[in-house]
Every structure is written in C-alpha cells, then in structure tokens.
Amino acid sequence: FSGDHAEVDWILRRLALRRPGPMLAVGVSLGGNMLLRWAQEAGGEASRIVRAVAAVSSPVDLTAVSESINRGFNKRVYTRRFLATLKPKALAKLQQFPGLADAEAIRRSEDFLAYDNAFTAPIHGFADAHDYWARCSAKPHLKHMRDVPALVLNARNDPFIPASCLPTRGEVGPAVTLWQPHEGGHVGFPAGSFPGHVADLPQAIGAWLQQHL
C-alpha cells in the first residue's frame, strides 16, 4: 500500500548491507510517497542509510489525488483500467486467505474509494479509505523533515495530482526542496522538439542528488 514505509526500510537496509557506501534513493509516483514516509518515520536513522531522497510525480496528498482520479476522464479511462488489474490480484489473495476482505464488495468497486474501503483499508488495519489516505499521505509530515535532504518534484499539469494540493514552501521543512514546473505531466517531463526526449528528468534529478554525496 502507498504508505508502507516498513517495506521501504526493509529494502534499503538490505541494499546497504549488500553494497556498503553512500546511497541515494528515488521513488516514482506512489513509490515516492512511500519513500518520503519512510524518511519521515526513520528520522535520524534515515541519514545513516541514505544521503538524500527524491520523489518524482508522487501523490503526497492521497485524499486529493484519490478524489481527482475518481471523477471525469480519469475515472472513465485510468481508474477503470487500473482497477481491472487490481481486482483480480485482490480476489486471488482472498483465495489464499479467505475472510480477509469482502470479495463481493471488491468485485462491485468502480472507483478507488470503493476499492480501498473494500480491500486496501481493512487488510492493512485502517478504519476506511479516508483513514488510509490521511495516515499514509506524506504531505502533512514534510514540515518535520530535517535529517535527510529530500527533493519533491511535481509538474503542475499532472493529470492525476491537482496543482492545488501540492505542498508549498511554508508546508515543508528545511531539508525539503520543491520543484514544481508548469509542465511535465505524470512522470513525463519531455524536452526538445517533437517527438522530444525524456533524458532531462533523470539528469536533473541525478545532478541534485549528487550534490549530497
């Protein structure tokens, strides 16, 4: 689930054991929200594992993003197709662990509010979808980030993440750098003449991260 910082901690600690030395971490979309939540929860311990983190096109306000993708074009196209991949996986999990969640409610779900109420929230111990989104969003915790430098990159025309919900300078701590270009979409950021290329994004993020090695 999108706030599973314990899984991020498990992965990073094992990477650190396998490859001792300075480490940088990048999370994309939901993975970026997870990475930021980990950095927040780990506090000072995070700085002993990574030198810096970056979150790209990450939904740090899960409530606002869920509401955005549950309406209009996003719901008709993206949500419908994404749920078509998620529901079979959830139902397969119920075959392994009967009674874990309500199978019929999962089958009926047509948006993420219904799906997270039926599956994600109950299996991870949340009261409901709104409780899950609120507790797993990185945005409310960004102001407390002081131990690890963090880059939070979001395009203001991301079709899934409304610009109105992006963090402002006053909502983040001194360790957080905000990049919010007007264009870039969701993990797009094309550059150059048509058809363009996407080399600028990893180069820019890499250059920012290298400053902290």
Which residues does each PLM region occupy?
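Alpha/beta-hydrolase active-site loop
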Residues: F1-R18, R37
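Short, hydrophobic alpha-helical segments
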Residues: A16, I205, L209-L213
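Alpha/beta-hydrolase-fold enzymes
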Residues: R19, L24-I123
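Short, conserved loop/helix-junction motifs that constitute active-site signature segments
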Residues: S47-R48, L142-R146, R169-G173
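Active-site nucleophile elbow and catalytic-triad environment of alpha/beta-hydrolase enzymes
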Residues: A118-L142
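Short beta-strand/loop motif that positions the catalytic acidic residue
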Residues: M145-R146, L151-N154, D158
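Conserved loop-alpha-helix segment in the C-terminal half of the alpha/beta-hydrolase fold
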Residues: R156-T177
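Catalytic histidine-centered segment of alpha/beta-hydrolase-like enzymes
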Residues: G184-V198
